[in-house]
């Protein structure tokens, strides 16, 4: 059986919590969207190299646990083609996204040449295209009529 150092575990947990809180504060202070800065319809988090959640803010509980599975989609899609400078965008409901208006950004974290984790943020966007304003279209017959679908795509590649 592995012995867990409770003090070290607590230090890491509080450090990760502090980081995700700072991510949340930065997003709130820099966004121009009232959906994000006033309604707090977003989440920030840290994940290990396999996409398992280490820490995540509690801004909107329905978004909890929504980013880890997308990390695994990114790993399946890109494999070893992930570099320290990459930035990946995603909102696709057919690859673990929860709705097209919730757009996520992922940044891999490396130590030397080894992927050790992910920093990610997901937030609700008022309108990202579609047949009607706001993305809610009760007459839609396909997802493309609601909003643009963005599978895991490198927004920036090192």
What are these regions (language model features)?
Residues 47, 106-110, 122:
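Core beta-strand residues in small-molecule sensory/regulatory alpha/beta domains
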Residues 25-33, 52-54, 68-108:
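Conserved mixed alpha/beta core segments that line enzyme active sites in large multi-domain catalysts
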Residues 2-63, 68:
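Long, charge-dense accessory insertions within large macromolecular proteins
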Residues 61-74, 126-135:
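A short, polar/charged loop-to-alpha-helix boundary motif
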Residues 37, 46, 55-57, 83-84, ...:
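General beta-strand structural signal in soluble alpha/beta enzymes
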Residues 60, 92-96, 122-127:
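Acidic, glycine-rich active-site loops and adjacent beta-strand->loop/helix elements
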Residues 112-158:
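Mobile "lid/hinge" segments at catalytic clefts and subdomain interfaces of large enzymes
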Residues 7, 58-65, 96-104, 134-141:
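Alpha-helix capping and helix-loop boundary segments enriched in small/acidic/polar residues
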């Amino acid at each position: 059986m592995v012995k867990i150092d409770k003090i070290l575990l607590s230090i890491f947990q509080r450090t990760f919590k502090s980081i995700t809180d700072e991510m949340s504060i930065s997003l709130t202070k820099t966004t121009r969207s009232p959906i994000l800065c006033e309604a707090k319809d977003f989440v920030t988090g840290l994940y290990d190299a396999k996409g398992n959640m280490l820490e995540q803010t509690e801004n909107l509980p329905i978004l909890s646990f929504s980013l880890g599975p997308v990390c695994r989609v990114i790993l399946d899609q890109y494999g070893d083609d992930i570099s320290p400078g990459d930035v990946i965008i995603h909102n696709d409901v057919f690859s673990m996204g929860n709705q097209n208006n919730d757009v996520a950004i992922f940044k891999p974290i490396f130590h030397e040449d080894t992927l050790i984790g992910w920093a990610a943020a997901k937030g609700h966007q008022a309108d990202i295209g579609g047949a009607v304003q706001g993305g809610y279209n009760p007459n839609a017959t396909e997802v493309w009529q609601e909003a643009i679908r963005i599978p895991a795509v490198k927004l920036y590649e090192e």
